[in-house]
């Protein structure tokens, strides 16, 4: 059964592309028509491509893989964080810090620093410091959490990255390509879909479209996680039965 349908995509405004003057020629196969100087995305293709992307995400998570959700444009920030948290995956919704993938060890040391500060704060160590110093450290925690809070539990490179707008996340895209991390992304009519392993033709500016696609990604993760839990329960049950026997 398809992940979504044309009606759902239409209601989310996923079919509205950019002005025809701003298009990327590689998107031609995903464009249905032009209307009032705007490209209209072929939603039949979107249904198929979204299905492929969701199946891939499901497969990765089924094998114990992790997904990093990336979307730093204003209209995506809150939605992306919400959906990533809902499925227990990592996210970046503020600025992409250069080197997150290509210099992961250095980034990891910053995360370790953040975690140490949070531990000290939780233990009440800040209460023994001068007020100004304690406030400065609390502000440092808040600052680091803004940029790294969504992936501070990430101990290795993600197995796949989901991107809301590739034209906005060029550094993330380049780092993923360099490190061989597969990309799933929403591609509007101004994007090059060839830069993405699993492109999803869609309006990437409308909040409803972003919400719809992000929620489908999260649903695919949750579905795989639930299937893993069932398998673990069955395996445990079989092992206990064998032991009892």
Swiss-Prot record:
Gene Ontology MF term list: structural constituent of ribosome
Record key words, sorted: Ribonucleoprotein, Ribosomal protein
SUPFAM superfamilies per record: Ribosomal protein S2
PROSITE patterns according to UniProt: RIBOSOMAL_S2_1 (PS00962), RIBOSOMAL_S2_2 (PS00963)
A GO CC annotation given for this chain: cytosolic small ribosomal subunit
Any one GO BP annotation for this protein: translation
InterPro entries found in the cross-reference section: Ribosomal_uS2, Ribosomal_uS2_bac/mit/plastid, Ribosomal_uS2_CS, Ribosomal_uS2_flav_dom_sf
Origin: domain of life: Bacteria
Recorded family membership: Belongs to the universal ribosomal protein uS2 family.
NCBIfam families from the UniProt entry: rpsB_bact
Descriptive protein name: Small ribosomal subunit protein uS2
Native source species: Dehalococcoides mccartyi (strain ATCC BAA-2266 / KCTC 15142 / 195)
């Amino acid at each position: 059964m398809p992940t979504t349908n044309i009606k759902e995509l239409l209601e989310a405004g996923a079919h509205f592309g950019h002005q025809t003057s701003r298009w990327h020629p590689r998107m031609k196969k995903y464009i249905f028509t032009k209307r009032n100087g705007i490209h209209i995305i072929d939603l039949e293709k979107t249904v198929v491509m979204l299905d492929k992307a969701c199946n891939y995400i499901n497969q990765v998570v089924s094998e114990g893989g992790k997904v990093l959700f990336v979307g730093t444009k204003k209209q995506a920030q809150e939605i992306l964080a919400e959906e990533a948290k809902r499925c227990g995956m990592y996210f970046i919704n503020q600025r992409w810090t250069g080197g997150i993938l290509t210099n992961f060890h250095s980034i990891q040391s910053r995360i370790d620093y953040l975690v140490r500060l949070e531990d000290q704060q939780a233990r009440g160590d800040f209460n023994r410091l001068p007020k100004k110093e304690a406030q400065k450290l609390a502000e440092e925690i808040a600052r680091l959490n803004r940029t790294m809070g969504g992936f501070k539990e990430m101990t290795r490179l993600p197995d796949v990255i989901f991107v809301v707008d590739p034209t906005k996340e060029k550094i993330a895209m380049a780092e993923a390509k360099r490190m061989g991390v597969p990309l799933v992304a929403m591609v509007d009519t101004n994007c090059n879909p060839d830069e993405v392993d699993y492109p999803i033709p869609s309006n990437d500016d409308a909040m409803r479209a972003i919400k719809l696609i992000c929620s489908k990604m999260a649903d695919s993760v949750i579905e795989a996680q639930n299937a893993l839990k069932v398998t673990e329960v069955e395996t445990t049950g079989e092992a206990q039965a064998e032991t009892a026997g």
